[in-house]
């Protein structure tokens, strides 16, 4: 395995710009939510789920603007922020082609099918670090049942993370954009993340989600290359 960070720009190109645009839209959603919560609290009342209705056109606009790449978007709340829901996910996704639907999962910690978003990387890292994060690829069992990459960032109020705003990209949408460029090159290539997990590959031997066995031996080099990459912390490798 050979690290090829120098060709990342050629492979991603306008795709990186599109993903940065999605990140910007998620940031806009986070700003709107932060302003909404601040306004409600300044009126000396606690926020409730009904207050979030005003965010739905913004979420729908994000989904429509990047429809072939973005499968879901919304906000996930820190426990106790909403007065009428100990935990809450205001998340909308393309279940069918007609219109976005609200995601419904069981948020009761005592339930056997409890969806524990607090432990999810896409929530936990932005909430604890105060910085944006890219998670994946992983199989999104809670929503799409497809390989996804989640872009997320914290919603901060007085320095505290009160929610996380995010968006799910489907890996198949990334493949449509990037694989044709990969296949034009002379050698098989893959994009891998800092953990050595394959995001995209032009080789049938390496599919999204697989851990490359050679990654462990050069993990520090992979992590350094991914840390320098933006907006996606991935690095191309050749076989």
What residue ranges belong to the model's regions?
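Extracellular/periplasmic ligand-sensing ectodomains of membrane signal-transduction proteins
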Residues: 68-129, 200-202
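Juxtamembrane extracytoplasmic/periplasmic/luminal helical "stalk" adjacent to the first N-terminal
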Residues: 1-47, 147-148
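Short, basic/aromatic recognition patches
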Residues: 118-143, 171-182
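Soluble sensory domains of the PAS superfamily and closely related sensory modules
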Residues: 66-68, 118-133, 220-232
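Conserved beta-strands of PAS-like sensory domains
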Residues: 144-178, 237-239
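Short, glycine-anchored, charge-dense loop/turn motifs used at functional sites
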Residues: 80-82, 158, 189-199, 204
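Solvent-exposed, extracytoplasmic
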Residues: 169-199
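Extracellular/periplasmic juxtamembrane segments that couple receptor/chemosensory ectodomains to their
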Residues: 205-239
